[in-house]
Design a protein with these regions (language model features):
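Tandem CBS (Bateman) regulatory domains
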Residues: 1-10, 46-92, 100, 104-141
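Short, small/polar residue-rich loop motifs at catalytic or cofactor-binding pockets
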Residues: 29-32, 90-92
């Protein structure tokens, strides 16, 4: 499964001129901890709820927080496990997806990643998972 197949188009994106207050409201509304910031369809980074709460004034534009942007994105043609890895590595609640030109395609949420990971591991199948540990010599026939 490719990352482009998991894009969630319901999560909004921020622009540089959006206010900290607007960003915090969106984070609260969508129950996530990060939002993507985009300018002219180019992905600039993720801004975290923590960095927004640390801002001096909630009337400030997101633009003044650029030094806090997290550069975590995956390519649209990558395997979905790269998105899982990015989410773990950067500790984000969403993973931005970009195309080859760096244009923002959308985000994958942790919920969508967890569902895909469960399907990938066979968690939705009836039965159990058996792990066998054998010495290498027993592999031969």
């Amino acid at each position: 499964m490719l990352t482009v197949d998991l894009i969630n188009n319901n999560i909004p994106r921020l622009k540089l001129l959006d206010s900290v207050a607007k960003a915090l409201q969106l984070i609260n509304d969508y129950r996530i901890t990060h939002l993507p910031v985009v300018s002219e369809e180019k992905f600039l980074g993720l801004i975290s709820e923590e960095d927004l709460l640390d801002a001096e004034d909630d009337k400030l534009n997101i633009e003044v927080l650029q030094k806090h942007f997290i550069q975590a994105a995956v390519k649209d043609n990558g395997h979905f496990l790269t998105a899982v890895n990015a989410s773990i590595q950067f500790e984000t609640s969403v993973v931005p997806v970009i195309n080859e030109d760096g244009e923002f395609m959308g985000v994958i949420t942790m919920n969508d990643l967890l569902k895909s990971l469960g399907n990938f591991a066979g968690a939705n199948e009836i039965g159990g998972i058996i792990v066998l540990e054998m010495e290498r010599i027993q592999f031969a026939i």
